Amino acid sequence: MKKQESIHTQLPGENVNTGFTASQIYYSTYQVSKLTSHLELHPRDYSSQIGLWKLLGRRKRLLAYLFKKNTGLYERVLTKLGIRGLKVKGR
């Protein structure tokens, strides 16, 4: 619970609505970090690797949606999380 509470405080506007795109990106980033640390300990856990790839794809789609709908919020989410942005043509 403590991790989720800290995630809620980092959300822009402290929006605790889990349907909010930014909060979904935060939660998926938290899951990615957990799976990444797990895979460092267990590099041959292929089912977890597949789950990580699916989660990364979902986060990428959410980031693309957020970029189209609200570019300012997209930039704030990237800076708060410290992740790379999407590869967008003409940018």
Curated annotation (Swiss-Prot):
What is a single cellular component term in the Gene Ontology annotation?
ribosome
Superkingdom is: Eukaryota
> Where does this polypeptide localize?
Plastid, Chloroplast
Gene3D superfamilies registered for this protein in UniProt: S15/NS1, RNA-binding
InterPro entries assigned to the protein according to its UniProt record, in alphabetical order: Ribosomal_uS15, Ribosomal_uS15_bac-type, uS15_NS1_RNA-bd_sf
A GO molecular function annotation here is: structural constituent of ribosome
Its keywords, alphabetically, are:
Chloroplast, Plastid, Ribonucleoprotein, Ribosomal protein
Q: Which GO terms describe its biological process?
A: translation
PROSITE patterns (UniProt xref) = RIBOSOMAL_S15 (PS00362)
Q: Identify the PANTHER family for this entry.
A: RIBOSOMAL PROTEIN S15, BACTERIAL AND ORGANELLAR, SMALL RIBOSOMAL SUBUNIT PROTEIN US15M
Family the entry assigns: Belongs to the universal ribosomal protein uS15 family.
Q: How does it assemble?
A: Part of the 30S ribosomal subunit.
Per its record, how is this protein called by name? Small ribosomal subunit protein uS15c
Q: Which organism is it from?
A: Adiantum capillus-veneris
